[in-house]
Design a protein with these regions (language model features):
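Catalytic domains of carbohydrate-active enzymes, especially glycoside hydrolases
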Residues: 75-102, 328-332, 458-470, 537-541
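Polysaccharide-binding and catalytic clefts of secreted carbohydrate-active enzymes
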Residues: 83, 169, 174-193, 246, ...
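Substrate-binding cleft of secreted/luminal carbohydrate-active enzymes
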Residues: 455-605
Length: 606
């Protein structure tokens, strides 16, 4: 045996206490002291520059359809602009192309919106001979407001109403990949189509509905053929534990087991098969196969009718609409809303996407297996996803496609009017965005996310823009507030704004978005605290939306914005200075401290 090595035993060490936290920066000192994390909030050259030069964006968003009755005459537009300016805002974001693909200006390319109505609300109309964008541009120029025009890039229809040019042009629509499930019953020939979405009445009558919520069974059976409905109850292994007529469901003594489900047929043929072959004790299973469907055939999937970014005609159309506006109207900037993305991880799986991806990786691919395969946990029908060998390459490829489209947009805009700014709006919870292909961070942002490999990192688009707005849509203002209430600290304006600023990483200006609808049952002080946190963590504030009881909150804005500030994206050379300082720090080998990865709420700002 070799001689034992001498063992080094641990010894006590001494560690000095951390420095006392520095006093927080308060963009609105009149609102009073707020417990803010200045060490992390003040990070970066963009923050330092904005504070030193007294730069702060103050942007009011005007949603097209929600405000249609407020901007459908020249006089109304004048009143709206005056109200916003009088409250201290210095920029207006006006939506010219909403998700429907119908525009709010006189276009030679896109149809003009005529009216809009939600259930239970009066119809809002737009006179055919009135151009709201022209009136908005005129008033913003006259009243000294920076006008930024909003476009929903890859949306050409409203699925709640079936309106928009994407319906007349189905070839534009995003193609979704789905796994079509089939219920397998021993000794029954073939199988029965199974609904993909649990606890919903399927659109197709021949599909077997799946419920984990017994109340939904009771609610849905009367809606369609209750006399022919048949119900079987299965446990978590898929074994039938009960069966009954739909009309007798309410009196069934067997409850849905934990992890189990009720399967409901409402067509005569399917009900007969279940009755004959799915007896108590029989174990059922599910098989699935991939199908590819245009999003217009899935109206429950999401409200916007998303289009296919891999199609040249779709990209060209969007660029042509933007060029038409930049060329024809006196505007200060353009911004893409949150539809500069794909429909989800399930889209786009069109032939164009397959061809472009094969060119990207340089070989044929098994479609969709090399990328991913969806599946289901039977009987609850929870969707599963298994990555394929090219999954990481697929995420990079999708993000690269959108990044390059944004670069095309910047070139298009600047070639017409170099002074017009280009920006993007996104939700603040960055880990949502690989699924939809939008890498809104800087191309040198590093953080501990599985998807953020060196290739994906390079697809970051922040540096292409003049500013990035992130939806920090929370009502809890500060991290300290969340700690005191026992809440998740990531679901705060401060954490969202702080992370957004770190992700953009001096590549552009960062503005924090606040959603007024979230404050419906809150107090003016709650909104003041949110504005304070937004202004302390980023270089500006965007307020969404003018339709959200705006007049109720106007006194808060008047108080907040009474001290003038310069708009960062209009400050000569300031962003260039920020970028130069950042580049010099990198060249000197200075390594930034790790970004704090707060757990935000999925879907925030979408």
């Amino acid at each position: 045996m070799p001689p034992a090595r001498a063992q080094t035993l641990p010894t006590p060490i001494t560690v000095p206490p951390p420095p006392v936290p520095v006093a927080p920066y308060l963009p609105f000192p009149q609102f009073g002291l707020l417990p803010l994390d200045e060490t992390n909030n003040g990070f970066g050259f963009a923050q330092a520059t904005a504070r030193a030069k007294k730069l702060q964006a103050r942007m009011q968003w005007i949603d097209a359809t929600a405000n249609l009755d407020r901007i459908n005459t020249a006089e109304k537009v004048k009143v709206v602009v005056a109200a916003i300016k009088g409250a201290g805002f210095t920029s207006i974001c006006f939506e010219a192309k909403p998700i429907s693909g119908e525009v709010l200006y006189d276009s030679k390319i896109a149809p003009k919106i005529k009216s809009f109505a939600k259930a239970g609300q009066p119809v809002k109309t737009l006179p055919a001979d009135f151009d709201p964008l022209a009136a908005m541009a005129t008033e913003c120029r006259a009243q000294g407001i920076n006008l930024v025009v909003n476009f929903n890039a890859f949306a050409e229809g409203h699925q709640l109403f079936g309106t928009g040019p994407g319906y007349a042009n189905p070839q534009w629509q995003s193609v979704l990949y789905e796994e079509k499930p089939v219920l397998q019953i021993p000794f029954a020939a073939g199988g029965l189509p199974l609904a993909m979405r649990p606890n919903e009445l399927p659109l197709a009558e021949n599909e077997i509905a799946v419920y984990t919520d017994p109340a939904r069974v009771s609610a849905d059976i009367p809606k369609r053929n209750p006399q022919t409905a048949f119900v079987i109850v299965v446990d978590k292994a898929g074994t039938v534990v009960a069966q009954t007529l739909g009309t007798a469901w309410q009196s069934l003594s067997v409850a849905i087991p934990d992890g189990g489900a009720a399967l409901v047929s409402q067509s005569t043929g399917s009900s007969d098969i279940l009755r004959r072959f799915a007896a108590v004790g029989v174990r059922l299973s599910v098989q699935s196969s991939p199908i590819f469907v245009p999003i217009g055939q899935r109206p429950r999937r999401q409200v916007p009718l998303m289009t296919n970014p891999f199609r040249q005609d779709v990209r060209d159309r969007t660029l042509a609409i933007i060029a038409e506006v930049v060329r024809g109207y006196d505007i200060g900037g353009v911004i893409f809303d949150d539809r500069l993305r794909y429909a989800g991880l399930d889209g786009d799986f069109s032939p164009e996407a397959k061809s472009a991806f094969e060119a990207y990786v340089g070989k044929p691919v098994r479609w969709p297996d090399d990328i991913l395969r969806f599946g289901y946990r039977f009987p609850t029908m929870e969707r599963t996803m298994t990555p394929g060998p090219l999954y990481d390459a697929w995420l990079v490829f999708r993000a690269l496609t959108l990044r390059n489209f944004l670069a095309d947009t910047v070139r298009t805009v600047k070639a017409i009017k170099p002074q017009v700014t280009v920006a993007t709006y996104v939700g603040s919870w960055y880990p949502d965005y690989p699924d939809v292909g939008a890498n809104w961070a800087a191309d040198d942002f590093a953080a501990g996310f599985r998807f953020l490999n060196p290739s994906y990192q390079q697809t970051g688009w922040a540096g292409l823009t003049d500013f990035v707005v992130t939806g920090c849509y929370y009502t809890t203002a500060t991290i300290a507030d969340a700690v005191a209430r026992g809440e998740n600290i990531g679901e705060t304006v401060e954490a969202a704004g702080q992370f957004s600023n770190r992700a953009v990483n001096d590549a552009s200006w960062t503005y924090a978005g606040i959603q007024l609808a979230d404050f419906k049952n809150k107090t003016p002080d709650d909104l003041k605290r949110a504005l304070q946190a937004a202004g302390a963590t980023t270089q500006g504030i965007m307020v969404f939306d003018f339709s959200h009881d705006w007049e109720q909150w106007r006194p808060v804005f008047v108080d907040a914005f009474k001290t003038p500030a310069v708009i960062p994206h209009l400050a000569p050379d300031s962003l260039a200075d920020v970028r130069r300082q950042h580049a010099a720090k990198k060249a000197a080998g200075v390594v930034d401290p790790p970004a704090i990865l707060y757990r935000g709420k999925s879907g925030t700002g979408f």
